[in-house]
Amino acid sequence: MSDIFSLSSYDYKLPQDLIATAPTMPKEEARLLVYDRQKDSVFHLKFKNLSEILPECAIIFNDTKVIKARIYGRKDSGAEIQMLLNQPLQNSLFSCYIRGKVKVGTKLKFDLGVEAEVLELKDDSSRIVKFKKNEQILNTSEIYNILSHIGHVPLPPYIKREDTPDDEIWYQSIFAKNEGAVAAPTASLHFNDQMLDDLNKTHDISYITLHVGAGTFKGVEHCDIREHKMHSEFYCISKKAKNIIDSDIKLLGVGTTVTRCIEYYYRTKQPKGFCDLFLHPDNKPLRQDFLLTNFHLPKSTLIMLVASFIGLEKTMEIYKQAVENRYKFYSYGDGMLII
């Protein structure tokens, strides 16, 4: 028996060529590994089969929209820097990560006459900055508008290439509408209009918003996972989704962000706020029944969330099968359905 609290228990070996650097096209041809808990059986389908296999349930998606959060600039010295915006704060301040040495007071220059000043260095390696243009402080919506012109799609660190115009389409769900994420809720990337229409005919669909932060890629550093401090992300639950969660209808959460949002609301009854819920085999889901998700990094909080549904042993067994069957992994990869 593996120790559910030991970080090493969530490790597995993944051949580099199984990390997807672009999505399967057409989307419905992406592969789908299905695990049926009642039958304790695994079978292999494609996303186009999803509506045929899904039990009766309501479906909840995350409608967050990924911003072009990566920008390139220079210090006054001329040295180049790279910034990843993470989260808006109060008083027009922003939390971000900066590649390149900076200190409090460092001024950074970007295209379109945009400037930023570093106000604080945080212990988690993030930086607090304030943006200006023509000496006027920029608010969040103004910053998002500027990012749409000078920013780059914030591809995950394991996709080792520059972003392209295709990524602006690929790395965004078709129902994305509320700006603020710096990473996509990747289970949602598999859906096209036809698939959504088909599901709408047979299932009740609703939406939450959880702005996925850069913390989703942060590794667990403690050998005992109970010592991990979970990152916090803004969420808001629509009235329809709230009513569905408050009912006793069975629920499918599309993606780990939806799961955390559903479970955080179920525990706190707060329809809006900041979610820092860490699900793992000793902190199981209390409300959500089924999970649709991608295949996640070793030792990540995301694979631990999967294990909160089906246990550590079964999770690692299924991941081994997925590798052997050459499923594609991570953000642009294939999917897994737990029913």
UniProtKB/Swiss-Prot annotation:
It is an enzyme of class 2 (transferase). GO terms for cellular component: cytoplasm. The keyword Isomerase does not apply. Its main location: cytoplasm. It is found in: Cytoplasm. Its EC number is 2.4.99.17. GO terms for molecular function: S-adenosylmethionine:tRNA ribosyltransferase-isomerase activity. One of its GO terms (biological process) is tRNA wobble guanine modification. Pfam families: Queuosine_synth (PF02547). Pathway: tRNA modification; tRNA-queuosine biosynthesis. It catalyses: 7-aminomethyl-7-carbaguanosine(34) in tRNA + S-adenosyl-L-methionine = epoxyqueuosine(34) in tRNA + adenine + L-methionine + 2 H(+). Keywords: Cytoplasm, Queuosine biosynthesis, S-adenosyl-L-methionine, Transferase. Transfers and isomerizes the ribose moiety from AdoMet to the 7-aminomethyl group of 7-deazaguanine (preQ1-tRNA) to give epoxyqueuosine (oQ-tRNA). NCBIfam families: PRK00147.1, queA. This is S-adenosylmethionine:tRNA ribosyltransferase-isomerase. It comes from Campylobacter fetus subsp. fetus (strain 82-40). The lineage of its organism: Bacteria, Pseudomonadati, Campylobacterota, Epsilonproteobacteria, Campylobacterales.
